[in-house]
Every structure is written in structure tokens, then in C-alpha cells.
């Protein structure tokens, strides 16, 4: 018999249940079919960034071009974020979710416009079927504008998160330069069109699930970002849609996973494409992932780079739009496999 979800705010409240609540159960046509998922193998490229600013830069830029155009996802090693910074971030994030609920729910909100909030599922006010995920989401650039609203417990949370966010932002800026070059653009092109830039983080907590075949941590979706940089623990759960099938991405220690978001797809005029991915859960182990989402500022105007558009053989696929228009559309819906970008296609003549 399905467990009642009334009066419970977080999915972690149900982790010890025998069955998942009925409002987490996906229709039969929309279940993860875990037995049909392929193991990762060489599912996404692994790129070594050690010489990104050395004599092999052109080689690495070409590797990025290939990964972005063929996969939309890649892993990176020798990325410049110190291991100690990464380890502290994972430790304090897990400590946050292991606190008593009375401490965690101080930050609870179902309002997606809040710049720091604990919540559950994806957009709990719009999701018709809930997802087996709790999350803390926060804005982190400029850090001084937001740090005082971040959780103060665990006591080291703000200091550790600020150190991590600063280090990952530096990595993102290096990647954006290289990706700009991979498109044949000036290295500062993408950074310049993002306005003041915006950086968000999410701390995704996926508790053990008694019936993982019936639900998702997050269903298939594409990111609204320019790029996303994902730190995950050693519990498998990320899956990428490649060649008409779902492929599991096995965690590799000391790496990040990077994926192209919708805004990069627009800027590149479809040369690089945002890719469907999802998170699944399991019966035995909790899973923690920490994505950094990099966005334009809300007043930035996004559109295909002029250098990638011509009237002969490369017409603009998307119209230009203020990023706030996309942002509002993205959050006024549940998470869906259909991309928001369909609403931003350029008119055809």
C-alpha cells in the first residue's frame, strides 16, 4: 500500500519506507527501465586539461570541439580545482543533509525565485509526479551578495562553499575561453555576451530508494545553462542519452563532468547541442552530486554568434532574446524532455 506523503516536506523522510509514496510512482510508459541501460565504457570523452595553457592548447581545444559537437558531455581531469577543496565540499555537503530535519528545513521553500533554498523534487509546485531528490540550491556569484543567506550550519559550510565556488568559477572561465576558440571565435566572445554572469550551485541528495525502478532522481532533461560542471561522488546514477539509448556514466575519481546547456546551443547556432540526461536512484546507497550552473545575467541578450551565421549555408536557427524570457519559461513548467528552445527558434521565411 502506498505511503502517504501528506505533511512531509522532503523525500529523505521516506528513505526507510518499504514502498515509495504513490505521488512518486511514474506511469509505466515513463519509468527508467534500468535493465536496458548500457554501462558507460567510453560513453563520454575524458579530456586532460593539464596543458590547456601550454604548447598543446590547440590539441585540447580540438578535443573540446569534438566532445561538444559529438557528445555534448565530457569529463575533465587535471582541471585545477584542488583535491582538498573538492573533498571539503563533498564532506560539508553530506554533513548538511545528515543534520536533523529541524535544522535543514529552516531553508525550505517551494519558490524557485529564492536565491537560497532547500526543496525537493524539481519544481515541487509544478511537478505532477515527484522525483526522489532533495536539494539545496544557492546563488554564488558575486559571493558577497549571497553568502550571508547561505546555511550557517554546518559551521564550515559558508567558508568551504565560497572556496569551492571561487575555484570552479575560475575553471568555468578557462573552459569558456577554450570553447569559444573551438568555435572559431575570439577567446573572450562567450564570456563577453553573458553580461555580469550568474553562477548557481545545487547540492543534490538522493537517498536510498525502496523501489528505484518506479521513479527517478531526476527525469530526462536538458540544462538551461551555458555550461554545467558536475561534481559527483562514487555512487553511479548519472545517465546520458546517446545514440537512442540511455548510457550510465561511471564516476571517475578526481574528475568533473561538463555538459553543454541550452544557451551554448543557441550561441553556437546548433554546432554544439544540449543533451538529455537523467539521474536514477538505487536501494542501497545515498548519492550526492554538486552541479555548478553557469548562466548569463538575466538582462543579457542571447542569440547565435554573428560569426557563425551567414545567408548562404548557415542561417540563424534561433532568434535573439533576453535571457530572462528563457528563464521565466523554464521555471514555469515541470522538468520535461522537450527543450525550451523550441520557443526560441528563428521564424522561417
From Swiss-Prot:
Known EC number: 1.14.11.-, 1.14.13.-
Induction or repression: Induced by the powdery mildew pathogen Erysiphe cichoracearum. Accumulates upon infection with the downy mildew Hyaloperonospora arabidopsidis, the powdery mildew Erysiphe orontii, and the bacterium Pseudomonas syringae. Present only in or around the main veins of cotyledons and leaves infected by H. arabidopsidis. Induced by salicylic acid (SA). Accumulates in senescing leaves.
Short name of any one Pfam family annotated for the protein: 2OG-FeII_Oxy
Superkingdom as given in the UniProt entry: Eukaryota
All residue ranges annotated as the Fe2OG dioxygenase domain in the record: 197-296
Cofactors demanded by this protein: L-ascorbate; Fe(2+)
Residues involved in 2-oxoglutarate binding: 206, 287, 289
Keywords (A to Z) from UniProt: Dioxygenase, Iron, Metal-binding, NAD, Oxidoreductase, Plant defense
Keyword Iron: yes
Function: Converts salicylic acid (SA) to both 2,3-dihydroxybenzoic acid (2,3-DHBA) and 2,5-DHBA in vitro but only 2,3-DHBA in vivo. Component of a negative feedback regulation system of SA levels during senescence. Regulates both onset and progression of leaf senescence. Negative regulator of defense against Hyaloperonospora arabidopsidis. (Microbial infection) Confers susceptibility to the downy mildew pathogen Hyaloperonospora arabidopsidis.
Protein name: Protein DMR6-LIKE OXYGENASE 1
Organism: Arabidopsis thaliana (Mouse-ear cress)
Gene: DLO1
Amino acid at each position: 500500500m502506498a505511503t502517504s506523503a501528506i505533511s512531509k516536506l522532503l523525500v529523505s523522510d521516506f528513505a526507510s519506507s518499504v514502498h515509495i509514496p504513490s505521488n512518486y510512482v511514474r506511469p509505466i510508459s515513463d519509468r527508467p527501465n534500468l535493465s536496458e541501460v548500457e554501462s558507460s565504457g567510453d560513453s563520454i570523452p575524458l579530456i586532460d586539461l593539464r596543458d590547456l595553457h601550454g604548447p598543446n592548447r590547440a590539441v585540447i581545444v580540438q578535443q573540446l570541439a569534438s566532445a561538444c559537437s559529438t557528445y555534448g558531455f565530457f569529463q575533465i581531469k587535471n582541471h585545477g580545482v584542488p583535491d582538498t577543496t573538492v573533498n571539503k565540499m563533498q564532506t560539508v555537503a553530506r554533513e548538511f543533509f545528515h543534520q536533523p530535519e529541524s535544522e535543514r528545513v529552516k531553508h525550505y521553500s517551494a519558490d524557485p525565485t529564492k536565491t537560497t533554498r532547500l526543496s525537493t523534487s524539481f519544481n515541487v509546485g509544478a511537478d505532477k509526479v515527484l522525483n526522489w531528490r532533495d536539494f539545496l540550491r544557492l546563488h554564488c556569484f558575486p559571493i558577497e551578495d549571497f553568502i550571508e543567506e547561505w546555511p550557517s550550519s554546518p559551521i564550515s559550510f559558508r567558508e568551504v562553499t565560497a572556496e569551492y565556488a571561487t575555484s570552479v568559477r575560475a575553471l568555468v572561465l578557462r573552459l569558456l575561453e577554450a570553447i569559444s576558440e573551438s568555435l572559431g571565435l575570439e577567446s573572450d566572445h562567450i564570456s563577453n555576451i553573458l553580461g555580469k554572469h550568474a553562477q548557481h550551485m545545487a547540492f543534490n541528495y538522493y537517498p536510498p530508494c525502496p523501489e528505484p525502478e518506479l521513479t527517478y532522481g531526476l527525469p530526462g532533461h536538458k540544462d538551461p545553462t551555458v555550461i554545467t560542471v558536475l561534481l559527483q561522488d562514487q555512487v553511479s546514477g548519472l545517465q546520458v542519452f546517446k545514440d537512442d539509448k540511455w548510457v550510465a556514466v561511471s564516476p571517475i575519481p578526481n574528475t568533473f563532468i561538463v555538459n553543454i546547456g541550452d544557451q551554448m546551443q543557441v550561441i553556437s547556432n546548433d554546432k554544439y547541442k544540449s543533451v538529455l540526461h537523467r539521474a536514477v536512484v538505487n536501494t542501497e546507497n545515498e548519492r550526492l552530486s554538486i552541479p555548478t550552473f553557469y548562466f548569463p545575467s538575466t538582462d543579457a541578450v542571447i542569440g547565435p554568434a554573428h560569426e557563425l551565421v551567414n545567408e548562404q549555408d548557415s542561417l540563424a536557427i534561433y532568434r535573439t532574446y533576453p535571457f530572462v524570457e528563457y528563464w521565466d519559461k523554464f521555471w514555469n513548467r515541470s522538468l520535461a524532455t522537450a527543450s525550451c528552445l523550441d520557443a526560441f527558434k528563428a521564424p522561417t521565411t
